[in-house]
UniProtKB/Swiss-Prot annotation:
<dbReference type="GO" id="GO:0008741">
    <property type="term" value="F:ribulokinase activity"/>
</dbReference>
<dbReference type="GO" id="GO:0019150">
    <property type="term" value="F:D-ribulokinase activity"/>
</dbReference>
<keyword id="KW-0547">Nucleotide-binding</keyword>
<dbReference type="GO" id="GO:0005524">
    <property type="term" value="F:ATP binding"/>
</dbReference>
<keyword id="KW-0418">Kinase</keyword>
<dbReference type="InterPro" id="IPR018485">
    <property type="entry name" value="FGGY_C"/>
</dbReference>
<keyword id="KW-0054">Arabinose catabolism</keyword>
<keyword id="KW-0067">ATP-binding</keyword>
<dbReference type="GO" id="GO:0005737">
    <property type="term" value="C:cytoplasm"/>
</dbReference>
<dbReference type="InterPro" id="IPR000577">
    <property type="entry name" value="Carb_kinase_FGGY"/>
</dbReference>
<dbReference type="GO" id="GO:0019569">
    <property type="term" value="P:L-arabinose catabolic process to xylulose 5-phosphate"/>
</dbReference>
<dbReference type="Pfam" id="PF00370">
    <property type="entry name" value="FGGY_N"/>
</dbReference>
<dbReference type="InterPro" id="IPR005929">
    <property type="entry name" value="Ribulokinase"/>
</dbReference>
<comment type="similarity">
    <text>Belongs to the ribulokinase family.</text>
</comment>
<protein>
    <recommendedName>
        <fullName>Ribulokinase</fullName>
        <ecNumber>2.7.1.16</ecNumber>
    </recommendedName>
</protein>
<keyword id="KW-0808">Transferase</keyword>
<keyword id="KW-0119">Carbohydrate metabolism</keyword>
Length: 545
């Protein structure tokens, strides 16, 4: 009997799972919030811009060390039977280190410098740099930009590197290596300096055939090309391959065998496809958490405007992986729950239920459109298909009779409409969607929301029993790297998670949602394209004030 470890680094917490490689059984698991959380409003008592989202990399090591120690001890499994470790991580979450892979934010002189810290995926401080990259690529007719949806996001690696170059050159001077935090964990485990094709391909303008797009970087600033060449470029390991064995010192520290193999890191949402068993084209998978990623696989590379990228072999060898997404989903619902009136909070507490459960109870019998509300779910910008992190959310139709649960439902519907925009974009560019999978903690807990999605999309929705699908997917890659399975497909078939339930659309609800979706699309186009300056002008007052 063999086992593999899957370590899942999410936005707010980390998870370490021990998985049976034969049947996918979860033998032991460890879940812990990051000690320093997400650093958003202040750093060590100093105020930071509202567009910033940072983390302390020491939290990642804490998760790994405490988690592995716990699952080995709790499971009583012989460490010699643990054949591999897989890592998934939010992305693009980037880290700046010295030549020994020590994060520069640990240097005393940079303790209070936000640019020394990990830049989390939802850090939007590099929006000006992203715009410059985009405009330069368009002016120079860089046709390969179509592989990235004809857009550049401030969430990606290169804009974040430019941000540090422009605003904190002293950090760049002390930095030897820049990498995805997922690559950093893999390198710490193996004492190597490699990069995953998944992270580079989706977030750093790197392609297997051509490497980095220095043609663009040179036009921006020759110094940028040199930074990428000296600090980012490294040997690339593809998903499905092995990076190597655990470093001897790390094996001793973690209590694992020195023969344990380590796989390259995979982006967290992408790992979910493996965890739920989506291995084919014509299947769209929604990985739903603080944000939502909409993933598809295809044999061909299509240039789909507004998506986040397409990379060959980033999930399944020989297939192109496509990613689109929404920047605020779980975060948005949490925001709405925190605004609930005290009477709702008290009622939920008295009935021993969450505010979410109470609001779901209040809306579950409403018909689409009953509240008279419609919302734009851009509270953390719009990733797809507008690719504009500077957009903000709106709600329309409020009256003096509007109740808090009506607002909640409007936001549930808004995220479903946003998903439909993405699905239609895939379909318009020759990628048919026959099946829709939903995975993550939210679908598992919120059947009301899933009913809304099924009827908005007008598709059968397959909800997976997969609150921890990324960790399972990471463990699958660990199993492959450790030789427990001959291929990713074999490992997926053996270890994937089961279906929880399925929902079929209802004709009357579908028809009503078609009317609402037309209104959503009209507002989407007005405030996203035609009159986007309205929101941005208001936001500029906030930035300047």
């Amino acid at each position: 009997m063999s086992y593999s470890i899957g370590i899942d680094y999410g936005t707010a917490s980390g998870r370490v799972f021990l998985i049976n490689t034969t049947n996918g059984q979860v033998v032991s698991k460890f879940v812990k919030p990051y000690t320093h959380g997400v650093i958003e409003s202040e750093l060590n008592g100093l105020k930071i811009p509202h567009t910033y989202a940072l983390q302390n990399s020491n939290d990642y090591l804490e998760i790994m060390e405490e988690g592995i120690s716990y699952i080995v001890r709790e499971s009583k499994i012989d460490p010699d039977n643990i054949v591999g470790i897989g890592i998934d991580f939010t992305s693009s979450t980037i880290i700046f280190t010295d030549e020994n892979l020590n994060p520069v934010h640990n240097l005393k002189q940079f303790k209070n410098n936000p640019h020394a810290y990990v830049k989390l995926w939802k850090h939007h401080g590099a929006y000006k740099e992203a715009e410059k990259l985009y405009q330069t690529a368009i002016e120079n007719n860089n046709k390969w930009l179509g592989h990235y949806g004809y857009n550049v996001s401030s969430e990606w690696m290169i804009p974040k590197i430019m941000e540090v170059m422009n605003r904190a050159p002293e950090i760049m001077e002390k930095t030897a290596y820049i990498m995805e935090a997922g690559d950093w964990i893999v390198n710490k485990l193996t004492n190597k300096n490699i990069r995953s094709n998944c992270g580079l391909g989706f977030k750093a303008f790197w392609e297997e055939e051509t490497g980095f797009h220095y043609d663009l970087f040179d036009k921006i600033d020759p110094k940028l090309s040199k930074v990428i060449q000296d600090k980012v470029s490294a040997p690339v390991v593809n998903i499905g391959e092995a990076v190597g064995k655990l470093d001897d010192k790390m094996a001793q520290k973690l209590g694992l065998s020195k023969e344990t193999m380590v796989s390259p890191f995979i982006i967290d949402a992408h790992a979910s496809l493996l965890g739920i068993g989506s291995e084919k084209d014509k299947e769209m998978t929604m990985v739903m958490g603080t944000s939502t990623c909409h993933l598809m696989l295809n044999e061909k590379q299509h240039q789909v405007p507004g998506i986040s990228g397409s990379v060959k072999g980033a999930i399944i060898p020989e297939l192109f992986a496509y990613e689109a997404g929404q920047s605020a989903v779980g975060d948005l619902f949490e925001y709405v729950a925190k605004q609930a009136p005290k009477s709702y909070v008290d009622e939920a507490a008295n009935r021993n239920m969450t505010v979410f459960e109470l609001m779901n109870e209040k809306i579950k019998h409403q018909m689409p459109g009953e509240s008279g509300l419609i919302a734009l779910d851009w509270h953390n910008g719009n990733r797809s298909v507008l690719s504009d992190s500077n957009l903000t959310g709106c709600i329309f139709g409020l009256t003096l009779q509007t109740k808090h649960e009506d607002i909640y439902r409007a936001y549930l519907e808004a995220t479903a409409f946003g998903t439909k925009m993405i699905m239609q974009q895939y379909q318009d560019w020759h990628m048919e969607v026959e099946k829709v999978f939903a995975c993550g903690g939210i679908p598992k807990k919120n059947a009301v929301m899933m009913d809304i999605y099924a009827n908005v999309l007008n598709k059968k929705l397959i909800v997976m029993d997969s609150e921890y699908a990324p960790a399972i997917g990471a463990a699958i890659l660990g199993a492959v790297s450790g030789g427990a399975h001959n291929s990713i497909n074999d490992a997926v078939d053996a270890m994937k998670e089961p279906i929880l339930y399925e929902i079929n659309p209802e004709a009357e609800k579908v028809q009503r949602y078609e009317t609402l979706f037309k209104a959503y699309k009209a507002l989407h186009d007005i405030h996203g394209y035609k009159k986007a300056n309205i929101m941005k002008d208001i936001q500029s007052l906030r930035v300047e004030g």
